[in-house]
């Protein structure tokens, strides 16, 4: 072979191989999962499924190494400040000592610290507990001796 552009063509079909490597991400654009072989140290090969979302390509980064391909999706969630009031429209700071709600586990400012003011989910169960406690207290205070008739 003296010319660089000449390529030797094998005579049998079994010897024909594809020379150019395929991009695994390009092949699976329309599939919902991609099975990647991940080799662990001396323990064998593990087959794992990695879900892909072809629509979220603008918010994700793709890294591929050797035998495994991974797709990492960044989640953009809105985090509240640690000491801000948990009420939706309030932006004031939560009270440190009196702002904790035991029923919904929220931290509220002095305006929204009461269960009625922040529309607590545990308001009905709290009312039932207080009603039962008052009934038990009244029953314990009642006199048990029969009344004397004159």
UniProtKB/Swiss-Prot annotation:
InterPro entries, per the entry: AN1-like_Znf (IPR035896), Znf_AN1 (IPR000058)
Gene3D superfamilies, per database record: AN1-like Zinc finger (4.10.1110.10)
Feature: compositional bias, Low complexity: 53-70
Biased composition (Basic and acidic residues): 23-33
Alphabetically ordered keywords of this record: Acetylation, Metal-binding, Nucleus, Phosphoprotein, Stress response, Zinc, Zinc-finger
SMART domains registered for this protein in UniProt: ZnF_AN1
Phosphoserine carried by residues: 43, 54
Sequence positions that bind Zn(2+) 1: 85, 90, 109, 112
Ranges where the record places region Disordered: 1-82
Major subcellular location class: nucleus
Chain residues that bind Zn(2+) 2: 101, 104, 118, 120
N-acetylserine, modified sites: 2
GO MF terms held by the record: zinc ion binding
Compositionally biased intervals (Basic residues): 71-82
Any one GO CC term of the record: cytoplasm
Zinc finger (AN1-type): 79-128
Alphabetical GO biological process terms: cellular response to arsenic-containing substance; cellular response to misfolded protein
Localization annotation: Nucleus
Described function: May have a role in protecting cells from metalloid-induced proteotoxicity.
Additional facts recorded: Present with 9520 molecules/cell in log phase SD medium.
Name of the molecule in the record: AN1-type zinc finger protein TMC1
Biological source species: Saccharomyces cerevisiae (strain ATCC 204508 / S288c)
């Amino acid at each position: 072979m003296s010319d660089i552009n000449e390529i030797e063509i094998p005579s049998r079909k079994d010897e024909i191989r594809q020379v150019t490597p395929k991009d695994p991400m390009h092949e699976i654009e329309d599939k919902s999962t991609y099975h990647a072989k991940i080799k662990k140290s001396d323990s064998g090969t593990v087959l794992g499924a990695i879900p892909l979302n072809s629509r979220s390509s603008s918010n994700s980064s793709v890294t591929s190494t050797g035998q495994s391909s991974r797709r990492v999706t960044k989640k953009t969630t809105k985090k509240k400040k640690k000491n801000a009031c948990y009420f939706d429209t309030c932006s004031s700071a939560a009270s440190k000592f009196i702002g904790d709600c035991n029923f919904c586990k929220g931290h509220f400012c002095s305006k929204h610290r009461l269960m009625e003011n922040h529309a607590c989910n545990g308001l009905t169960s709290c009312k039932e507990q207080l009603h039962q406690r008052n009934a038990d207290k009244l029953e314990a205070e009642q006199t048990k001796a029969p009344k004397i008739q004159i």
